Amino acid sequence: MTLYLQLAETLGSRIEQGLYRPGDRLPSVRAMSIEHGVSLSTVQQAYRLLEDRGLAEPRPKSGYFVPAARQMPPLPAIARLAQRPVEISQWEQVLALVSTVPRPDVVQLGRGMPDISSPSLKPLTRSLARLNRHADARALAYDGIHGSPLLREEVARLLVDSGCRATASDVVITTGCHEALSVSIRAVCEPGDIVAVESPSFHGAMQSLKGLGMKALEIPTDPVNGISLEALELALEQWPIKAIQVTPNCNNPLGYIMPESRKRALLALAQRYDVAIIEDDVYGDLAYTYPRPRTIKSYDDDGRVLLCGSFSKVLAPGLRIGWMVPGRYADRVLHMK
């Protein structure tokens, strides 16, 4: 853990334990630097991280303070849904959304994507330019069906942060997370099969189901704990569900991070009814926590979770680099791909 992260964790714990109360002034940057023997820039990074987490707020010429307690509006109630599979019908709304011509002066709230104008991407663009200059004819050839061995090794290393112990041989490279999700669905389902989904859910995932001829069974989902396990179990008892599709970390659109105990309970439910879990972890690295939240895949000991991810939300969507860890479905995934 880097110095600024350690410092942020230490001070954040003091705030959460009540040692600093709402409205209290936090130690100055210089005082923290002297107390912990670190540079001023390290302290500033730590305070910026605490600010991002809502634990500190800067005041001009006054330093950092613990934010005053805010009255949060009530969370929306879980909708009462008809527990039956339905055909997906969102073509017109989705087409209107994706057909919108991006304007450089308008924040694209309809699309989850990083700011590609950020100076932090300059090292990436320089690296891409250098690779293009030195590329030879091999760069124009097909990779193996699994994808680049070097890239798969790096993805496997990255997955360690989410608690997932995978090797390069477990990873399959895809053209973005959307392809990973589509291939996962095709690997475990046939046209007309039923897939349990969170409600509300990401429109792109729903369009994948529709395009592949699947039926969606909406499961009520709340913005704190995620998909209702009680409603899901009832649905599993009533319908021949082939897969459960979820985004447990930094969910789109609700934003929740599913508690770890509920991730384990969801996996146990899938094991009891012998269904696959298709896990979309494309937003998982955006969590304001260290370490980042674990994936359901990290608890999977029988290979029923197909983990999907990409760099689209943390680096740049134009890279079109995604991956999946398909577990027991690896052969079918490679066949579908």
Where are the predicted features?
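Glycine-centered flexible beta-alpha turn that most often forms the glycine-rich phosphate-binding loop
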Residues: 280
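Residue-level detector of conserved, well-ordered beta-strand and adjacent loop positions
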Residues: 67, 110, 220, 297, ...
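Short, Asp-centered acidic motifs that coordinate Mg2+ and/or phosphate
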Residues: 241-243, 275-276, 306, 321
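Short, solvent-exposed loop/turn segments at secondary-structure junctions
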Residues: 112-116, 178, 202, 249-251, ...
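N-terminal basic, amphipathic alpha-helical segments
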Residues: 1-130, 333-337
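Conserved core segment of the aminotransferase class I/II
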Residues: 301-337
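A general structural signal for well-ordered alpha-helical segments in protein cores
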Residues: 121, 151-152, 330
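Conserved core of the PLP fold type I
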Residues: 133-273, 284-302
